[in-house]
Amino acid sequence: LLDSDAVLDAGHIGWAARLSQRYPTVEVRVGDAQLEAADSVLLAALVRGLVLTATAAPGPAPEPELLDAGLWQAARYGLGGRLMGALGDSSAAADQVGMLLEHIRPALEDSGDLDYVHRGVQRMLVSGTGAERQRAAYASEGWDGLTSLFGSALTAEA
């Protein structure tokens, strides 16, 4: 893409996750606009667990088609639907999240994130994601409900 002048620089290539060109970090570009600071911290802890797990014991790379389908399902159905796993299996989102947490459990324990991640995931499974909560607030109370949600969520402690 760079050689063909299709993009200006590597920063414009839109992978869902990639190594940073400038910093010793992994950039994740899906689900990165969270409603609450606590959700952003939860996402960061999950990504750290995934990265530490993958670097400690790399497994086989999932098929790109499965990644694309899984990403589409997650964007479309969120935590309320069925999601595809890395091997193409499909089950309730809560079950897939549970399998993910079990997979990265050693890394979460080593980094001290296990309890925080479990509480955050449980909160999302019960209360909904930020997107789900915004849709529900708007459906029940219109703009006033959305404004009220933003007022409480955007000022909540992490």
What do these predicted ranges mean?
Residues L1-A158:
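C-terminal accessory/tail domains of diverse enzymes
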